[in-house]
Amino acid sequence: MYKQLDTLLAQAGISLTDQQKQRLLGYVSLLDKWNKAYNLTSVREPRDMLVRHIMDSIVVSPYLQGLRFIDVGTGPGLPGIPLAIVRPDANFTLLDSLGKRVRFLRQVQHELRLDNIEPVQSRVEAFVAEPPFDGVISRAFASLQDMVSWCHHLPAAHHGRFYALKGGVPQDELQSLPAGVSVDQLIRLQVPMLEGERHLVVLKSD
């Protein structure tokens, strides 16, 4: 799979160290192993995980501004763990309410020696951000309206951003954003070998 990952990274124009590549593959291996017992993802094949989980996550990396991020509704660590591997300079809090997922995240943290992630079991509304985060990230977590409503207390007041990974452009969601929140960027993502559109919606508080 190393060769497949190399090919995908080259197609995406992403340059990583050998250690980063090995950690990404190690994460896929752990996800595949735990998935058999814990049903963490509907994607069953490791080769598909490379495209639909790893590449789909790390193409967001160039657009993240800041050093402290929280991945809300992270599930098995997506996109937080792949992003933490490719952004060792930044810290990622991985938030999920389900114990089995958080146990998996802690195992990944231990086995891959990732010191820039912090798995936390909590509902997003109950989590206290001290200090607030540079960015709040979500992938298949909620509508933009719900994301802003549930996570409004998490980003830093002036420079904090919401980063939502979406498929097609969510026009209905964009038109129903709550007052005081606007679109900062709408970025079409290029994910090698992935069918369908992918977009990153970046929101800011006015």
Swiss-Prot record:
GO molecular function: rRNA (guanine-N7-)-methyltransferase activity
EC number in record: 2.1.1.170
The keyword Methyltransferase belongs to this UniProt entry's keyword annotation: yes
SUPFAM superfamilies reported for this sequence: S-adenosyl-L-methionine-dependent methyltransferases
Residues annotated as signal peptide: none
Residues noted as binding S-adenosyl-L-methionine in the record, renumbered to the chain: G73, L78, V124, E125, R139
Pfam families referenced in this protein's UniProt entry, alphabetically: GidB (PF02527)
InterPro entries in UniProt: rRNA_ssu_MeTfrase_G (IPR003682), SAM-dependent_MTases_sf (IPR029063)
Subcellular location: Cytoplasm
Gene3D superfamilies the record matches: Vaccinia Virus protein VP39
A GO CC term attached to the entry: cytosol
Reactions performed catalytically: guanosine(527) in 16S rRNA + S-adenosyl-L-methionine = N(7)-methylguanosine(527) in 16S rRNA + S-adenosyl-L-homocysteine
Keywords attached to this entry: Cytoplasm, Methyltransferase, rRNA processing, S-adenosyl-L-methionine, Transferase
Family the UniProt entry places it in: Belongs to the methyltransferase superfamily. RNA methyltransferase RsmG family.
PANTHER family, A to Z: S-ADENOSYL-L-METHIONINE-DEPENDENT METHYLTRANSFERASES SUPERFAMILY PROTEIN
Function: Specifically methylates the N7 position of guanine in position 527 of 16S rRNA.
The protein's name in its UniProt record: Ribosomal RNA small subunit methyltransferase G
Gene name in the database record: rsmG
